[in-house]
Amino acid sequence: MNTGEAAPLLDVADLRTHYGRIQALHGVSLSVPQGSLVALVGANGAGKTTLLRTISGVHRASSGTISFDGRDITRASADLRVRSGISQVPEGRQVFGPMSVEDNLMLGAYTRPLAEAQRSIERIYAMFPVLEARRVQPAGTLSGGQQQMLSIGRALMAQPRLLLLDEPSMGLAPQLVAEIFTAIVALAREGITILLVEQNAHAALSVADFGYVLEIGQTVMFGRGRDLLADERVKQAYLGM
């Protein structure tokens, strides 16, 4: 499924994933064009997180294909996918609490030479100054919003071409949600391709070039972000309108 004129950096075709005997994805297909921000919205249990984890290699696909930059990575290891340019910001942030902010960031650069990691960390500090101010502080003592910034920064340390964001606004106050989405838009403007999973459908579709709606492990709607925002079915099901 092609979302536009730009060639897809990520192409998922008829993807199926199981947890034991339980099927979580039922033939999902989607494309993420190079340089775009694509939002994936849907209710809890729709399969959004499972899809991201299957793309990143945390979960194994039962069938279907995942192509990245024209290469089939369906059976590639998670480590190889990171080295190829895919980074994921997991749901719930998952920072290493006892470790310092800077050590958490450096963990994200394990595939990069030290000199590149040092340049990357300065870029992260410029993007999120609060992290630099707390660079020696244990990550577990940060606020929820600061931990989300740290989680995003850690993923960026790998210098990804594709950033997978899983529920970045979860549990955050409205002001912090706005800050996180401002950062996401800035990353997209820098040319990083983003696949954003978000239950806050209005926030996600407002910034997305394209969007998909996932229901019970299947993609059921696709369109430009602004068009999905105006769609009556999306309004009723996900926007509370």
Report residues per predicted region.
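Glycine-rich phosphate-binding loops of nucleotide-dependent enzymes
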Residues: 2-241
